[in-house]
Regions:
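Electropositive, glycine-dotted interaction segments
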Residues: 110-258, 262
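Conserved ABC ATPase signature
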Residues: 249, 265, 269-318, 322-327
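Phosphate-binding P-loop
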Residues: 31-37, 315-318
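Conserved P-loop NTP-binding catalytic core
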Residues: 55-131
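Phosphate-binding glycine-rich loops of NTP-binding sites
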Residues: 38-79, 239, 307-313
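Beta-strand secondary-structure signal
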Residues: 20-22, 33, 110-114, 121-125, ...
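Short, Lys/Arg-enriched N-terminal segments with co-localized hydrophobic residues
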Residues: 2-16
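N-terminal pre-Walker A segment at the start of P-loop NTPase domains
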Residues: 14-29
């Protein structure tokens, strides 16, 4: 009933923090488990796997958008994204006593990604389909997906379990089949997000969709943030920052205006940022001490534009469970 549904969802309404990230068999990462805190700084030597860690996070985000298989295809397919080392590393290989060499594969091809959060955890296992004459015979498919409650995956706290085309949802002490014909190329988030019968799926999907990746803010002459854009209320800045002016206006209306202005003044004393609306299109105007006219976003230096993008990202009104950026 509605009361039971509310009780089931209520503890998870805030934007939860990730507590653990796990990656196996992805590019230069053989098996990695990373504890997460509120702020995480990843450093390491060249070739240590920093970019692979970041890309794995982006692949996880694609599961909630229905594009994880397409994202893998853009990276060159499953064969190009799998662990590039041998299937197993012997103790002597690890100690450097013998060369690292491969051998005949003993286990099925498998790429595993997952995370645990303050409320739910999620894991996905991608592999190759059974041999066929299909033109898509080399497309990866989803072998298994699991959603659980708590910091660790156990049978007792598993809430949703997908194996191939079949997905089951916890129903008290029993299991209920929620779908028997799931597409192998699409995550369960796009196929059984039922707020009444599978609220965990819907809640986790919206959480992942709230993740933001601010690693490639463009600042060239044709950058989206430099151009006037159609504007609507924008509680969270987009990945590419095209809605910067709308996000800025939203913060000024419903956010912490004093903190926003203080961040501008901290880098540019006496400056202020305004939003100009013409024909439904929003653009930024940058007024600086000593200048007789405001500068448009198209005139700003690369560094100034990126700084304003970061201010908008960090002063967002809506809670974000993951905001990620490359240094």
């Amino acid at each position: 009933d509605d009361a039971a549904l509310e009780q089931r969802i209520a503890p998870h309404r805030k934007a939860p923090m990730l507590t653990t990230l796990a990656i196996a068999q992805y590019r230069s990462l053989h098996a990695l488990v990373v504890p997460m805190a509120r702020l995480n700084l990843v450093v390491g030597a060249n070739g240590s796997g920093k970019s692979s860690l970041y890309r794995a996070l982006r692949l996880l985000a694609e599961t909630a958008q229905g594009g994880v298989v397409s994202a893998l295809a853009r990276e060159g397919g499953l064969q190009s994204t799998l662990w590039a080392g041998p299937e197993t590393l012997s103790a002597r290989m690890r100690r450097g006593e013998v060369p690292i060499e491969g051998g005949p594969r003993q286990q099925p091809v498998s790429l595993k990604l997952g995370f645990a959060g303050e409320d739910f955890g999620y894991a996905i296992d991608l592999g190759l389909p059974a041999p066929s004459r299909s033109l898509f015979a080399h497309d990866p498919e989803i072998k298994r997906e699991v959603i659980w409650g708590g910091p660790f995956l156990r049978l007792g706290n598993t809430l949703v379990d997908r194996r191939g085309a079949l997905v089951r949802v916890r129903d008290g002490r029993d299991w209920r089949v929620a779908g028997e014909h799931l597409n192998p190329f699409e995550s369960l988030f796009g196929q059984i997000a039922d707020p009444r019968n599978a609220p965990e799926v819907l809640q986790l999907r919206e959480t992942i969709r709230g993740w933001r990746f601010y690693d490639h803010f463009r600042a060239d002459a044709d950058a989206p943030a430099r151009l006037p854009q159609l504007g609507t209320r924008t509680p969270v800045l987009s990945h590419d920052g095209h809605d910067l002016a709308a996000a800025w206006a939203t913060i000024r209306e419903i956010g912490d205006v004093e903190a926003l202005d203080a961040a501008v003044a901290d880098a540019f004393p006496g400056a202020r940022v305004e939003v100009l609306v013409e024909g439904g299109r929003f653009s930024l105007q940058f007024r600086q001490h000593g200048l007789l006219r405001p500068l448009s976003a198209a005139e700003l230096s690369d560094g100034t534009l990126r700084y304003l993008l970061w201010i908008a990202a960090l002063h967002t009104r809506s809670a974000i469970s993951l905001a990620n950026s490359l240094a």
